[in-house]
Every structure is written in structure tokens, then in C-alpha cells.
């Protein structure tokens, strides 16, 4: 039986001499490992891994979150610093601290099936929300992310209600699936709503 992908990616941080296509995944796997196991992390014990089966967040979705930022976002801009890894961890830790404050009832104690916030589609789309707040506002702090996410909150339907994706696309809170199409739609919706709110300030 082949090794499960999630286990391969979990082992990547300990493997050297990898081909280029694996290196961004290796970096993401390391960041996620640290966030999952550092006691003061806002994601401590939250990510489901072979070494942490009690976690509920998708390891793959969280790696995608990091990779989006590393490929063309905040983390990419940190690469010029010697402590870029520490900056990357701090950024994501601060963002998810804010997520847990602003969306407390949609996060605490819930599984992905009960909250799209903790679902693969929600997590990956949130990476673009973080990037928008960073690129538009220079946000890296917990307080800055809390302020930005509060603007977005009225437009979300993580656990109940409907997503008003467009005039012709309205779907129940759990009608968003973990597919590239739905992730793209949710990302576009969240970032457009946030841009509108930021302009009003």
C-alpha cells in the first residue's frame, strides 16, 4: 500500500536533497508542524496529522495556506530576512489568533462538518483574506487582523445562514465544497467583501 500523502508531507521537513517542487511543500510542512506543536500557538493541537490524530484541521489545507503566502504573498516578502521562518510562524499565529477571537462561536469545539471556517475550503480562502489585509493594510499583528476580520464577519455564513456568492448564486452555509471551483468562488466573495469594507473606512 502506498504511503498516504499527508504522512509523506509530514515527513518532508526531515528529508534533505529534495527536488525543487517539494521544497515549498517541505517549508509549509515545517511551519505547520511548529504551529501544531508549539504550546502557545493559536493552532496548538488543531491540525490533524499522523502524529496528532486528534486534530481536526486538514494538514493539506493548512500547508496550502502557507504555500499560497510563500509563493506570492507575505511570507515571500519575508524571505529576505534571516529570521523569515520565525516571521512566518508569527504571522500565521497572529492571524489565527484573530480568527479565533472574531469567529469564536464558529471555531471553538467544532469539526469541519459543522463549520466551514475549519473546512478545507474555508481555510484556503482565508489565506487570501490574510494576504489582502497584509498587502492593503500592512497588517501582521493580532489587533490588526482582528480589526480586519470584524469587517468581514457580517458577510460570512460559516455555521448557519446562506452565502450570497452572487445575485444568481446563493447557497446554504454548508453548500461550499472543498473543490477548486468552490474555493475560488469563496475566495473571490470574501476578498471582494473585505475590499468594499476597507474602502468604506
Segments (PLM) and residue ranges:
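Acidic, carboxylate-rich catalytic segments that either coordinate divalent cations
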Residues: 166-201
Amino acid at each position: 500500500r502506498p504511503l498516504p500523502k499527508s504522512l509523506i508531507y509530514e515527513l518532508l521537513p526531515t528529508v534533505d536533497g529534495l527536488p525543487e517542487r517539494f521544497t515549498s511543500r517541505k517549508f509549509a510542512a515545517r511551519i505547520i508542524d511548529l504551529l501544531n506543536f508549539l504550546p502557545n500557538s493559536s493552532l496548538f493541537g488543531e491540525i490533524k496529522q499522523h502524529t496528532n490524530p486528534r486534530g481536526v484541521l486538514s494538514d493539506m489545507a493548512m500547508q496550502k495556506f502557507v504555500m499560497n503566502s510563500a509563493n506570492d504573498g507575505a511570507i515571500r516578502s519575508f524571505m529576505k530576512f534571516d529570521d523569515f521562518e520565525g516571521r512566518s510562524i508569527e504571522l500565521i499565529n497572529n492571524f489565527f489568533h484573530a480568527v479565533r477571537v472574531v469567529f469564536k462561536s464558529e471555531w471553538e469545539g467544532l469539526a469541519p462538518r459543522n463549520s466551514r471556517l475549519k473546512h478545507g475550503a474555508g481555510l484556503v480562502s482565508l489565506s487570501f483574506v490574510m494576504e489582502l489585509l497584509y498587502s492593503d493594510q500592512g497588517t501582521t499583528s493580532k489587533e490588526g487582523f482582528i480589526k480586519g476580520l470584524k469587517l468581514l464577519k457580517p458577510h460570512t455564513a460559516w455555521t448557519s445562514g446562506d452565502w450570497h456568492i452572487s445575485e444568481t448564486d446563493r447557497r446554504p452555509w454548508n453548500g461550499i465544497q472543498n473543490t477548486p471551483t468552490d474555493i475560488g468562488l469563496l475566495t473571490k466573495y470574501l476578498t471582494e467583501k473585505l475590499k468594499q469594507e476597507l474602502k468604506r473606512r
